């Protein structure tokens, strides 16, 4: 087999971009403790071991796809933190590969710039290392736009099937698909209207479509079957299929009421809010922020395909700005189209001057993203003063969980240790201790029937109430689970943990 080194050399920049992206998303992947949401997602995947399927809940605001991906990853590789995060990492890297495919429409320089900006983006790296749904939604949103442009420019059947498959996967991922699909659809009449005051150049008329009615029936028929398959819990719970439309009432209510996630400090006029723009500026998402400005260029006569992307991107940003519910990881659903727009403007400017001038423009932008991204992901990943660090579990949790897991892994009988966790909010602990069979979880209004447990966790404010009930010697470990939660105290039975922790018990009951 002969290797075409000339062809390989031509693709070296793309290979380098992907390798950098993989490194930033995989290196020290378990350095950051499991997030609250990761614990919930992992717990849902764990329940599939008991029930055999994922029982869809329309009030959970997330589709079933990520839970099945996590279940598969943990089944293949074990219940490890890196395995929990592996599906999201895969989706994040595939998103970069998908952006590179836009060279078919916008040329290689624009596609490479967009992919490199995503590879280095602090947000895409930070949340690409989280086991949450958003990375999947980004991937499928990119593929939907790719399919739309493909149908527009070539009309090929493959783009019809890609469109159906990508929309289906968006629906399976998160209810915000309505927002993204809505923006893509509404951008069409806006594009058609705007051509009158500002004619496009070039216009790119709709290509002759090569697909048939049978292709449409096949593509969307298969999509419907796939949706029913996953939402019905692999055909085991058909009543859950109604959640496909029931979820939107709950999602709309949460989106408007915000549930403590509103960002009123950034309000402008009425429902308008500049939180996302402020986040781009604060968190070194400068390529995307300049991409917002670059999008204004397409108000003037310009390539109608870029104009369509600009309208869609602006509509998505506007929609997320109006919605009251704002969590920082949603930003990755908005950034990527602006990379394409900035790349297009840079490519246009450089073509009129000198290609080397590109690096004088691009390097400071990407260097800022890389600097902050490395600092955020590998040094200050639990610092609450950082906007992307949001209800993140503190490293303190390891002071409690590591001794428990160490004892359990050294002796299989350790997974039979009894525990009582008495916290109002205790995730990600149920996922961390998912292999233990005798742990009870209690809220502030309930207590265990006895106190003779191998480990106990309480709010520190209840120490004086709980300690008189302890009948064994315990080591006392204070820790903070996350911001917004009171300090916690863990009690580890001395007869189980004294050697592991390496100190004498703090509490010794009187005979």
Predicted feature residues:
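Loop/turn elements at helix/coil->beta-strand transitions in domains of secreted/extracellular proteins
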Residues: 175, 415-416, 436, 451-454
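Membrane-integral, polyisoprenol-dependent glycosyltransferases
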Residues: 2-356, 363, 367-368, 376-377
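Aromatic/acidic, Gly/Pro-rich catalytic loop(s) in extracytoplasmic/lumenal soluble domains
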Residues: 451-511
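Short, hydrophobic beta-strand segments that form beta-sheet elements in well-ordered domains
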Residues: 419-423, 441, 456-458
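Membrane-proximal, lumen/periplasm-facing interface regions of secretory-pathway glyco-
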Residues: 251-252, 358-437, 484-509
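Flexible, charged surface loops at secondary-structure boundaries
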Residues: 220-221, 408-414, 446-453
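Solvent-exposed loop/turn segments at secondary-structure junctions
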Residues: 317, 445-447, 461-465
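A short, well-structured beta->alpha microelement
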Residues: 433-450
């Amino acid at each position: 087999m002969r290797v075409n080194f000339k062809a390989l050399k031509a693709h070296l920049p793309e290979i380098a971009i992907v390798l950098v992206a993989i490194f930033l998303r995989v290196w020290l992947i378990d350095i950051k403790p499991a997030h609250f949401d990761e614990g919930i997602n992992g717990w849902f995947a764990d329940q599939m071991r008991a029930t055999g399927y994922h029982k869809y809940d329309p009030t959970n605001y997330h589709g079933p796809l990520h839970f099945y991906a996590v279940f598969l990853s943990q089944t293949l590789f074990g219940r490890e933190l890196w395995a929990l995060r592996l599906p999201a990492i895969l989706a994040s890297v595939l998103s970069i590969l998908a952006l590179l495919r836009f060279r078919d429409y916008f040329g290689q320089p624009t596609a490479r710039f967009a992919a490199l900006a995503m590879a280095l983006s602090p947000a895409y790296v930070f949340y690409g290392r989280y086991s949450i749904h958003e990375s999947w939604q980004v991937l499928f949103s990119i593929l939907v736009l790719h399919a739309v442009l493909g149908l527009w420019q070539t009309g090929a059947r493959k783009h019809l099937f890609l469109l159906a498959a990508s929309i289906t996967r968006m629906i399976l991922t998160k209810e915000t698909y309505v927002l993204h699909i809505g923006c893509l659809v509404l951008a069409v009449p806006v594009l058609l209207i705007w051509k009158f005051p500002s004619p496009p150049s070039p216009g790119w008329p709709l290509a002759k479509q090569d697909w048939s009615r049978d292709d449409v029936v096949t593509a969307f028929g298969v999509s419907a079957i796939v949706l029913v398959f996953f939402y019905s819990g692999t055909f085991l719970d058909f009543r859950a299929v109604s959640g496909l439309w029931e979820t939107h009432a709950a999602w709309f209510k949460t989106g408007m009421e915000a549930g403590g996630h509103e960002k009123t400090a950034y309000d402008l006029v009425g429902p308008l809010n500049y939180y996302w723009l402020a986040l781009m500026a604060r968190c070194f998402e400068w390529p995307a922020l300049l991409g917002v400005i670059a999008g204004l260029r397409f108000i003037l006569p310009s390539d109608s395909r870029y104009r369509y992307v600009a309208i869609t991107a602006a509509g998505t940003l506007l929609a997320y700005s109006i919605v009251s519910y704002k969590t920082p990881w949603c930003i990755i659903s908005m950034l990527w189209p602006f990379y394409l727009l900035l790349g297009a403007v840079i490519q246009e400017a450089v073509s009129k001057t000198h290609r080397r001038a590109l690096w004088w423009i691009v390097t400071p932008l990407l260097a800022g993203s890389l600097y902050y991204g490395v600092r955020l992901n590998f040094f200050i990943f639990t610092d609450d003063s950082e906007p992307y660090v949001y209800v993140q579990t503190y490293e303190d949790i390891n002071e409690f969980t590591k001794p428990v897991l160490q004892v359990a892994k050294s002796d299989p009988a350790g997974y039979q240790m009894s525990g009582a966790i008495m916290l109002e909010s205790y995730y990600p602990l149920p996922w961390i201790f998912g292999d233990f069979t005798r742990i009870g979880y209690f809220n502030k209004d309930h207590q265990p029937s006895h106190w003779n447990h191998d480990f106990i966790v309480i709010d520190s404010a209840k120490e004086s109430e709980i300690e008189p009930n302890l009948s064994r010697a315990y080591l006392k470990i204070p820790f903070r689970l996350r911001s917004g939660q009171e300090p916690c105290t863990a009690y580890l039975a001395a007869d189980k943990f004294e050697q592991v922790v390496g100190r004498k018990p703090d509490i010794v009951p009187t005979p």
